[in-house]
């Protein structure tokens, strides 16, 4: 009788390995090698012998979960947060702040030289601030537990979509951290618990603003409970529906923040930097590097609500701000009016598309500043080169796209003159940086 070949089923057991960590990447993630393959592992430090479980096995590399540190590094420290082992909010509390910054700086230089093929200059001093209670913005995950029949509030678990319930967070501004427990208590009293999405907390100068995602239509009883909660906590509360519409449920103040003597108003859903003091330092450094005078016309791309535009307008002859979100363009215009600035103009434009035919794009500019989101600004870089400004300052929250986009400037005749890191997000793998290019 013929025998048919039956391939053996692949084992579903996760592979467990032991190896030595050699270095850290710019996310403060450990890198080692096992059987010739690069292994990325959070929570491990250079020099450590570790035991790990493979999570995601690719041809050239793999991601692994730390199970045991066999030989700890001398610079390993105890995390200051009780939730650190589980919570995915921070990933570098086991490393001192100076070592975190050094790893990120080394990663920044490596990305420029390896990915961008650009020789990095000696880095500028890191812009630093407080490393705890620094976040003025956070997004809390909310999940209804069917088994416990209760609503849980916290952050996503490390390397998972599960939720870690927390009582407080030491990197949040203290008023935001103190709001978590009473918020959980309030949400557990709602009839519409299953329809809750997430809650965004923002610390404005006037107080706390909360944007609560609600995918249904809360009844009058739930609305009354939420309003009572907002009043008792002294916060403003907005609801965001599934179609993204935002409804003020309890509004007392117009949120704003101060910047270099200016007052910048914002609204729920607007982007603002999470670290207020570092934002102040960042804007001051960008203005100093750009060096605008009363003879200069400046272009500010991805301008948001005017975070760089309005301080620049006090130095330059004229500033043009361009932003893809129409609501933030309107907010930037209002911020110019409320601060008595009449030499700033704002336009809405999709900066990932073709901008050649736009009126502002045909104007001449002496200086350019850009501060794009994580995807970077590749589509607009060629046009920046064509404008031929004297200097370009690029502020970035993603060093990978910064290094990539910088190639366009260098090939267009610009030199990378200054490069530095801003410690906007201590204890995390996020890296903010700034680069200056000159013709």
Swiss-Prot record:
Sequence positions that bind S-adenosyl-L-methionine: 273, 302, 307, 323, 350, 371
Protein name stated in the entry: 23S rRNA (uracil(1939)-C(5))-methyltransferase RlmD
This protein's encoding gene: rlmD
Annotated catalytic residues: 397 (nucleophile)
Primary role: Catalyzes the formation of 5-methyl-uridine at position 1939 (m5U1939) in 23S rRNA.
Keyword match Methyltransferase: yes
MF annotations from Gene Ontology: 4 iron, 4 sulfur cluster binding; iron ion binding; RNA binding; rRNA (uridine-C5-)-methyltransferase activity
Enzyme class: transferase
Any matching Pfam family: TRAM
Record key words, sorted: 4Fe-4S, Iron, Iron-sulfur, Metal-binding, Methyltransferase, rRNA processing, S-adenosyl-L-methionine, Transferase
E.C. numbers: 2.1.1.190
Residues reported to bind [4Fe-4S] cluster: 81, 87, 90, 169
Domain TRAM: 10-68
UniProt similarity note: Belongs to the class I-like SAM-binding methyltransferase superfamily. RNA M5U methyltransferase family. RlmD subfamily.
Catalytic activity: uridine(1939) in 23S rRNA + S-adenosyl-L-methionine = 5-methyluridine(1939) in 23S rRNA + S-adenosyl-L-homocysteine + H(+)
GO biological process, one term: rRNA base methylation
